[in-house]
Design a protein with these regions (language model features):
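Conserved active-site segment of CheY-like receiver
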Residues: 24, 94-98, 117-119
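Active-site beta3 strand of CheY-like receiver
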Residues: 59-65
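Acidic catalytic/metal-coordinating carboxylates
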Residues: 48-51, 71-78
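Short hydrophobic/Thr-rich beta-strand motif most characteristic of the beta2 strand and flanking loop
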Residues: 40-47, 55
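Short amphipathic alpha-helix used as the core "switch/output" element in two-component signaling
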Residues: 54, 76-88
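Active-site residues of response regulator receiver
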Residues: 67-71, 95
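Conserved acidic segment of CheY-like receiver
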Residues: 15-27, 32-33
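Short, flexible helix-to-coil linker/hinge segments that flank and couple to helix-turn-helix
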Residues: 101-108, 112-144
Length: 144
């Protein structure tokens, strides 16, 4: 996989930023993991919201990347739980849906970045860094 131009590995102290990834589609998890590595340390890739909460409780990542629509707890519900417990610094939603209502729900829940899966190759890494800096990030497909 060819990396987006301008991407550079950034470290927190002496280590890469660590993340947990959640998506119910195995192929999507694999593609996103390949996109993120080696820039970030992917601690675990899980398939649902409950597993996401459990992984963040165990691993305390810097950032979580989560699909919205997953079995059981959806990405917004799981993200709300993770943020409420103070288990990570930032959450990035990765979704197929650009519905304004979903975007607003995510932002109200404290999720800092919303990236469409169609925009992920070009925008996921910048979105993660923006979220870690405390900034809000909406991918191009959401801003339209």
């Amino acid at each position: 996989m060819v990396r987006p131009s301008g991407a550079e590995v950034t470290y927190r102290g002496n280590r890469r930023y660590r993340l947990v990834l959640a998506d119910d589609h195995p192929d999507m998890r694999q593609e996103i993991q390949e996109l993120l590595d080696p820039e970030f340390e992917v601690l675990r890739a899980v398939c649902d919201g409950a597993a996401l909460v459990a992984a963040t409780l165990e691993l305390h990542p810097d950032v979580v990347i989560s699909d919205i629509q997953m079995p059981g707890l959806d990405g917004i519900e799981a993200g709300t739980e993770v943020l409420w417990r103070g288990l990570c610094e930032a959450i990035v939603v990765l979704s197929m849906y650009s519905d304004r209502h979903l975007v607003q729900m995510a932002m109200k829940a404290g999720i800092r970045a919303y990236v469409l899966k169609l925009d992920a190759f070009d925008e996921l890494i910048p979105a993660v860094y923006a979220a870690l800096r405390g900034e809000c990030y909406l991918s191009a497909g959401v801003r339209r």
